[in-house]
Design a protein with these regions (language model features):
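N-terminal Sec/SRP start-transfer signal
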Residues: 1-21
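Acidic/polar N-terminal loop/beta-strand segments that form early-domain functional surfaces
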Residues: 12-14, 49-51, 96-98, 119, ...
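Short secondary-structure boundary/capping segments within folded domains
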Residues: 14, 36-39, 84, 105-108, ...
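Hydrophobic, regular-secondary-structure patches
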Residues: 19, 25-115
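Short, well-ordered, mixed-charge alpha-helical segments that flank or form enzyme active sites
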Residues: 57, 101-104, 123-127, 284-288
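Short, glycine/acidic-enriched capping/hinge loops at junctions between secondary-structure elements
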Residues: 58-61, 105-106, 127-129, 193-196, ...
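Short beta-strand boundary microenvironments
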Residues: 110-135
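Structured soluble/peripheral alpha/beta segments that form catalytic or ligand/cofactor-binding pockets
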Residues: 133-450, 454, 459-507
Length: 507
């Protein structure tokens, strides 16, 4: 049931992902009295800049020359500047590149250094700064349309596509990438974890796929089902989210929903599980993803469906559980890792949905590492907070391989950022554990990926290669289900909500 790599979200020491994006806005500092200065890039009432950029740099044309930019600009545009939440205060917004140093080569081979500017025609006109045309026409093309207003299907493919290991990546044989889904029963008493995994160095011949499905009953038993797929029967793409692992598939439908179909056999038994679900992401409830690292530490994480509903059925030997609009979630993970642990969670909380986490690499043990907390509501992105710590109360006990392990019964974290406050309280209702040391002694879950699918049935895990995940001091990987309650004030308004979610830590 291991599910390692949501941790990618969690390189919070670097202010990963949306944490970085939102900080980059530096909106408070961007309310510049010089905003209409003719020497400034732009020309609107507000110019959004990378954090720390000196306004004088803009006046001298340094923005283009130094290649300043705002990471994940499309997300900033969609979730903040052009969002329904700010529609009453922002009438128009436009991305702009100004004075970028570019080299132009003529048909005759002559090369010239030029300054180039660019933007999206319709948005530039809306803010009153269209580029001057010497000749021709300047109008939106399909790429501009996708940037401004992608369809749900286009958005899924953009943030949920697959990747290749960077050329300088060490330990390429431990590369793994996967789609993960979960679905919760209407009574909140049972749930399923479903993973579609591609593992190994996909640029070589030593890689393959697997499907792992775990069915869990609260305070009851877990059943794990696994299918191995040789690379010849695996299809993935670096331009779209669709994945085929033999007969098991993840397909983005024209309406942007996910069609999820999977089949696997129970470990140590003959029972077969078949999954047929349609997962519908809630509008605007997504985390666009981030990819960081170099050498032996490369990873990425995206959440295309932070809040979603699932309809369909999960059947074991023809005995089916039906779902209609059930609570669901989907994320996408990729990378390589060694010697890390993490805290992670995703939960509904009334009309809100919360995502939190942090990763602790070998160099972070014993050091305080803040959490990253990402909050959305029906209008999309609401806030990013950075609690300094998460406080666990180990009031429960579980048995792992005959040993009693204390695990959390409660967890609390909170943060204050200016006038904004957030407090999150987790009440744990179910927990299971895995001794990663024992897993390391057994068959690697992906060691057989270069062999035929039925050559052997080694140990398999939920979320990729866990063998190097835990440190010796905290070898037990703990997966929890429970209730989350949030409270506080964001943007001058009270927030409050309670809901169900899944959480992870180590002991």
């Amino acid at each position: 049931m291991l599910r390692p790599w949501r941790s990618l979200l969690l390189f919070f020491g670097y202010g990963v992902g949306v944490g970085v994006m939102v900080v980059l806005l530096s909106i408070g500092e961007a309310l510049l009295s010089q905003a209409r200065d003719e020497r400034l890039v732009g020309g609107g009432s507000v110019t959004v800049l990378p954090q720390g950029l000196d306004v004088e740099v803009m006046k001298t044309g340094g923005v283009g020359g130094l290649y300043f930019s705002i990471d994940h600009g499309r997300f900033i545009y969609d979730q903040l500047l052009a969002s329904p939440r700010l529609a009453k205060v922002i009438s128009a917004a436009a991305p702009q590149i100004d004075g970028r140093l570019t080299y132009l080569r003529t048909a005759g081979g002559a090369e010239y250094a030029v300054r180039a500017s660019g933007g999206i025609p319709s948005t530039a006109r809306n803010v009153g700064v269209p580029l001057e045309l010497a000749a021709g026409v300047w109008q939106d093309d399909d790429g501009d349309r996708k940037w401004i207003s992608p369809t749900a299907r286009e958005l899924r493919h953009e943030i949920d596509r697959f990747h290749l290991p960077p050329a300088n990546t060490a330990n390429r044989d431990s590369w793994a990438e996967w789609h993960y889904f979960n679905v919760l029963s209407p009574d909140n008493k049972s749930w399923a974890f479903i993973s579609f995994i591609v593992a190994g160095d996909v640029t070589s011949e030593k890689w393959g796929g697997s499907v792992t499905i775990t069915l869990r009953e609260q305070d009851g038993r877990s059943r794990k089902f696994v299918s191995y797929i040789p690379r010849e029967r695996v299809r993935f793409s670096t331009t779209d989210a669709n994945l085929s692992l033999g007969g098991s598939t993840v397909t983005v439908r024209p309406d942007g929903d996910y069609a999820v179909s999977a089949e696997a056999r129970e470990e140590g038994g003959r029972d077969v599980v078949r999954v047929n679900l349609v997962v519908t992401p809630s509008p605007r409830a997504y985390f666009p993803g981030a990819s960081l690292g170099s050498g032996d530490f490369v990873s990425g994480y995206a959440v295309p469906a932070l809040r979603a509903s699932a309809s369909g059925r999960i059947c074991v030997n023809g005995e089916c559980e039906n779902y209609m609009g059930a609570q669901s979630y989907h994320d996408h993970n990729w990378g390589v890792w060694r010697g890390v642990t993490w805290d992670w969670g995703a939960s509904r909380a009334g009309s809100y949905t919360i995502l939190y986490g942090r990763v602790l690499g070998p160099d972070r043990y014993g050091r305080e590492t803040p959490l990253f907390v990402y909050l959305v509501d029906s209008l999309g992105f609401r806030a990013v907070m950075r609690p300094r710590r998460i406080e666990y109360t180990d009031g429960r006990t579980i048995v792992v391989d005959g040993k009693r392990i204390p695990v959390p019964s409660r967890a609390v974290f909170a943060d204050v950022r200016g006038a904004d406050t957030l407090r999150v309280e987790l009440t744990i209702e179910d927990a299971i554990g895995t001794d990663t040391r024992k897993q390391a002694e057994g068959q690697s879950p992906f060691a057989n990926q270069t062999r035929s699918a039925d050559a052997e049935r080694g140990r398999s895990e939920e979320r990729g290669d866990p063998l190097r995940a835990a440190d010796a001091e905290r070898p037990y990987f703990i997966q929890m289900k429970g209730a989350a309650r949030i409270s506080g004030r964001i943007g001058g308004g009270v927030i409050d909500g309670t809901g169900t979610g899944f959480f992870e830590t180590y002991r």
